[in-house]
Each structure stands twice: as C-alpha cells, then as structure tokens.
Amino acid sequence: MVTETNPARTATDMLLVNRAADRAVEGLTLPIPQGARVFVDETYFQAENARYALSAIRAALSEAGYAIVRERGEADAIFEVRAGALSLDQLRRVVGIPDMRVPINESLNVVSLPELSLYSNRDRMGVAEFSGFLYDARTGMPLGAVTPMIGQYKIRSHKAFMMITWGQQLAQPGERDPGSSWKEF
C-alpha cells in the first residue's frame, strides 16, 4: 500500500522561500571588525521557515569573517535580527475565464469550474526581508543597524489553450537560478 501525504507547503514553496532567504543575506557585513565574536539574537525573528533563514544569516556572517558564538556572554556584539517577510507570493494572469467556485443552491453548495483560457501564466515568488541592529554585548551601546536585507526567487510558468505548457513549473532541488522564462509577458 502506498501512502500519500499532503503537507501544508509543497517542496517548491519551501525551496522558493529558502532561496529568497539565501539571496537576502548575500554579502551581509556588520559595522564591526572581522573576527569579532557575534551572538545572533533570534528573539524577534518570527516566521515560517525561520530556522532556515537564521542559519543562512549565521552562515553569511561566518563567511564574512565573524566568529559566531552560542552564548551571549561569549560575544563582543549582539546582532538582533527580525523578519519583515519570509513567505510566498503568487500572481496569476488569465486571458479567458479563470477557474472559479460557483454556488448552486441556497445551502451554498459549490461546484468548481475549470479555467477556460487562451493563455495564462503563473508567477510564484519567494520573498525574504530581514533587518537588524547591532549593539555592544557588555555596554548595550548601539554599534549600528543593518538596513533591510531583501531577497526574491521567482519561477514563471505559461499555458496556452489550456494544454500547452512551458516555463518552470517547479523549483528543483540543487538548482540555483532558473533565469528568465523563455518569453516574459
């Protein structure tokens, strides 16, 4: 017997958001000398997929030459991070009649009608925005702020005459950048 699961988020959804997080932290630096010991305070970083994004922030700081510490008491500086967005946006354009749900009686039972289109496209975009500020671990004095780190990762798919499809339907594991779709409309 084969068991099929229906997770709350698809693998493509998770990959889009995680890749946006990776892009948001590219080139992250702090206004302190390299080699400084930094504690990443995640108290105000609340979002779905927060663990992945926080790991991406730590990896970017480590790559930039900072020593990441696990305890506040070991740090020269505290980097308090917060999430502005870490989610998925979707946009669908249809030339024709989009799929819809139509009530069929007073009980509000509905019937689903399929899309009847000449052309449609669908954009799915992972969006990540983080910011934070840095303060001295001993004195609490501010050392600087990190302006919003913004990352996006988008795939676009197209459909003509309800059957002919092209473009990227899924984000593939290990794939880094799909580039632009064959034709962008």
What are these regions (language model features)?
Residues 1-62, 66, 169-185:
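A structural "domain/chain start" motif
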Residues 59, 63-68, 72-141, 149-185:
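Surface-exposed short loop/turn segments
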